[in-house]
Every structure is written in structure tokens, then in C-alpha cells.
Amino acid sequence: MGFSVFSPTRSLDGVSGFFQGAFLLSLFLVLFKAVQFYLRRQWLLKALEKFPSTPSHWLWGHNLKDREFQQVLTWVEKFPGACLQWLSGSTARVLLYDPDYVKVVLGRSDPKPYQSLAPWIGYGLLLLNGKKWFQHRRMLTPAFHYDILKPYVKIMADSVSIMLDKWEKLDDQDHPLEIFHYVSLMTLDTVMKCAFSHQGSVQLDVNSRSYTKAVEDLNNLIFFRVRSAFYGNSIIYNMSSDGRLSRRACQIAHEHTDGVIKTRKAQLQNEEELQKARKKRHLDFLDILLFAKMEDGKSLSDEDLRAEVDTFMFEGHDTTASGISWVFYALATHPEHQERCREEVQSILGDGTSVTWDHLDQMPYTTMCIKEALRLYSPVPSVSRELSSPVTFPDGRSIPKGIRVTILIYGLHHNPSYWPNPKVFDPSRFSPDSPRHSHAYLPFSGGARNCIGKQFAMNELKVAVALTLLRFELLPDPTRIPVPMPRLVLKSKNGIHLRLKKLR
């Protein structure tokens, strides 16, 4: 009898051969990756040998977790100018916290390596580079002209008053309040009304919490993705539980911003509203985008429009919410400065709640306290660049092309070489006659790519502080001292809890 080609023996031999081939291929890939890992690590060690570092794990790098700020401040004191941080065995970045180093990097046009943010905020001002970034920046700058910002002050005051009214109803001096949640809704309310022509108050809308919760989740998820040795691979990340959570949070965020765009487009279908918008000397943020024509005569694409809306929706509310919350905490823990600010505000506003544009320049001491709080608690702990060409610093040390450098704003603001007793709250650092390096204080970053909305944010900070101090004395909760932790914006590991004492 002849031997069949479909016999069990032949089939088993085929299966065995397949698995042997698969095993050898897998072994080759593992060895290839190991060699690639080794060569990359050796190249980094050689290229960055001038930048010191503490010992790190060969695979996990400096796994600092929630000890990051403590370790970083140690590095700032121990390693002048800059140091090396290993994020994994083959991924490193150079941390910069000296003004002279920072000035060099911010004077260049290197791209921001924030691709992990793209699924959420798209390619708006934060992620764009080159000619397109310049076009969008020039297009949006008029949205922050002082003629636009002036009437925003009343809108800001109204939003703050809604928050304070809610606090009065909840007021119980014996039960501290976690304030970031309320401040975040207030700043979202403000940016929605000012930049996106929103009617009503998101602070009174129970559905708004889903957006702020999504932003909170994305803050954590993106931060951990950037620090992970494995999540840099999109396939692995998308298959992970974090990847699934990220997609869901992005969906919620996009539904919110899509709704904002859709609502404004519908309003502009009304001829009266359309003519009203066109007669404005300076358009609001969203209207600029909707009316925009690029240099080639084409309208802004829907993708570009949503990216800019997503970007400003995030940066315009979450960063400012962080800043306001930490300013409140700083004043609560320094009652003598809080009282002096209150006296200054009362001398300008009396016991009323009317704040105008002109009032904002009449609060010099309050402004000094705000600036000092933003130094101690930098709302944006760091910003990064990926070098498009080699860079050499004033002391002769160099970094090659392709390396990520991180301007550690938190470290810069705590550098004892430029800020004596950096942990001490001292508003006099910002008195008019106190000189400092041009790049020693950067709460809104610096250079050509600084925060486009920095004046908007400072105005909101002043309004929030002034109106809050008229109605409440801020007291710390000694049982829950905030623990700052780095995320996309500065957060507290255990929240920011304050006791509120009603003044009137």
C-alpha cells in the first residue's frame, strides 16, 4: 500500500517544523532586541557622559514613582545646571534647571515630543511644529488681545461667584473641602463662556463632571504612558487596560468639544448672530477658528479646528485650575500674607464683588503672592523638546541630535543658586526692585512657544483670589497636607483640602 502525503506522521513533522521555525524566529528577534538595547544604552552612556546621574536600574531606570520631586530637588542641589535621568534601560533624557541652559533651549525651534497627547488633543498649537505652527499661532494671537480680555474679567468674576456661592452652601469649618474639583469646574465654566461663547454655567450642569473626570484620567494615563518602557509601542498600549481607559476618556473629551463646536456653528446659522460676530473688532477664540481662512484661501479643516479647541479647552482650564488651587493653599498656610492681600483687595473693591480690568493692576502685593505661589507650585512642572540638531551650553557641555531635553520648571523654581531658601514662601522676591535672571521664572514657559493664554490665566488668577478673599478666610487642614505630584499639570497625591471660614 502506498504512503499518503496526508498521513499523520507527515502532518506531525510539518507542525513540528513550524514550531521550530517560530521558536528560532522568536529567539532571533529577542537577541536582535537585546543587541539593539545594548547598543542604544552604550551610545547614550557615551553621548551623555558629561551629565551626571545617580545609580539607576539597568532595565527600569530611575523608577521614582511618587518620590520624583524629592529626588529631583536633590539632583538640583547636587548636580549644577543639568543631570541625566534614565526612564528605562535604553531611554534617557537630560533635565535642565539652570536659567542659562534653559535660555539656550527656548531660543531654538526644536519640536515638542508630545505625540502621546495626539489621540486626545490632536495637532493644535501644543503639538504643531514649523510653518503650520507659525500660521496657527499668528491666527490665534488676536484672541488674546487686551480688547478681547477686558470684558472677560466680568465673565471670570461671575464664574468665581458661582463657585463661592456653592462653597457658602457647603461651608462647614470643621469639615475641610477638597477645592480642586470646584476650581476645575469654575475654570472650565470661564473658558467655555469666554472662548467658546457658551450660554449658561457648566458649574450647575451635572454632566460637566464627566469631562473634568476624563481630563483627570488622561492626565494620569498619559503621564504613565510616557514613563513606561513598554507603552511607547502603540500596539502594546492599545491592547492594555490603560489603553482602553485612554480611548474611553478621549471619547468623552471629544464628545464635549464636538458639542461646543456644533452649538456655536448652529448659533452662527442665525443671521443676526452671524452679523454680530462679524462686527466685532476682535473675534473670540472659537469664532476665529470658524471664520479662519488659511494663506491658500482654504478654510481651516475640521480636524485642525477640533485640535485647537481640544488643546485650549484642556490648557485653558486644567492648568489654570491647578494654579488657582495651589495659590489658595499657599495663602492658607501663610495667613499673614493672606490678610495683607485681603486688606489690599478691600481697599480697592470695598466689600463689593465688582472687579474690572482696571482693578487688576491695582493689586501689587496680591500679584506678588500669586507669582510666588506659582514659583513654589509650578502648574506645569516641566516642558520638553526633542533636539533637531546638536546643542552646546555655556559651560561647553553638548547634547547630540535626537535626545530629549526636559526643562524642569519645578526644579528651576527651586534652584537655590537663583532662589535663596527656595522652600520659603517670600512674595518680596517679586517686588519691582528685585532683579532676577530672565529665565529663572517660567510658570508659562518662555521663548516663542510660550503659553499663548498667559495673560488670560493671570487675569483669572487675580479675579479668583480677590473675590475669594473678600468672602472667605482660607485655613489649612493639618490632617491632610497636600503632596505635590507631577502629571501633565501639578496635582496633589491626596487632594488639596482647605477649611473655609465665612467672612460675611
From Swiss-Prot:
Catalytic activity: an omega-methyl-long-chain fatty acid + reduced [NADPH--hemoprotein reductase] + O2 = an omega-hydroxy-long-chain fatty acid + oxidized [NADPH--hemoprotein reductase] + H2O + H(+); dodecanoate + reduced [NADPH--hemoprotein reductase] + O2 = (11R)-hydroxydodecanoate + oxidized [NADPH--hemoprotein reductase] + H2O + H(+); dodecanoate + reduced [NADPH--hemoprotein reductase] + O2 = 12-hydroxydodecanoate + oxidized [NADPH--hemoprotein reductase] + H2O + H(+); tetradecanoate + reduced [NADPH--hemoprotein reductase] + O2 = 14-hydroxytetradecanoate + oxidized [NADPH--hemoprotein reductase] + H2O + H(+)
Residues annotated with Phosphoserine modification: 434
Xref: CDD domains: CYP4B-like
GO cellular component: endoplasmic reticulum membrane; intracellular membrane-bounded organelle
Cofactor(s) this protein cannot do without: heme
InterPro entries: Cyt_P450, Cyt_P450_CS, Cyt_P450_E_grp-I, Cyt_P450_sf, Cytochrome_P450_Monoox
Pathway: Lipid metabolism; fatty acid metabolism
Binding site for heme: 315, 451
Record's subcellular location: Endoplasmic reticulum membrane; Microsome membrane
PROSITE patterns: CYTOCHROME_P450
Membrane topology according to the record: Peripheral membrane protein
Propeptide residues, chain positions: 1-4
Molecular function, one GO term: arachidonate monooxygenase activity
Stimuli inducing this protein: By clofibrate.
Enzyme Commission numbers on file: 1.14.14.80
The organism's place on the tree of life at top rank: Eukaryota
PANTHER family referenced in this protein's UniProt entry, alphabetically: CYTOCHROME P450 4A14-RELATED, CYTOCHROME P450 FAMILY 4
Stated family: Belongs to the cytochrome P450 family.
Function according to Swiss-Prot or TrEMBL: A cytochrome P450 monooxygenase that catalyzes omega and omega-1 hydroxylation of saturated fatty acids. Exhibits preferential omega versus omega-1 regioselectivity and (R) versus (S) stereoselectivity for hydroxylation of lauric and myristic acids. Has low activity toward palmitic acid. Mechanistically, uses molecular oxygen inserting one oxygen atom into a substrate, and reducing the second into a water molecule, with two electrons provided by NADPH via cytochrome P450 reductase (CPR; NADPH-ferrihemoprotein reductase).
Name the UniProt record assigns to this protein: Cytochrome P450 4A2
Lineage of source species: Eukaryota, Metazoa, Chordata, Craniata, Vertebrata
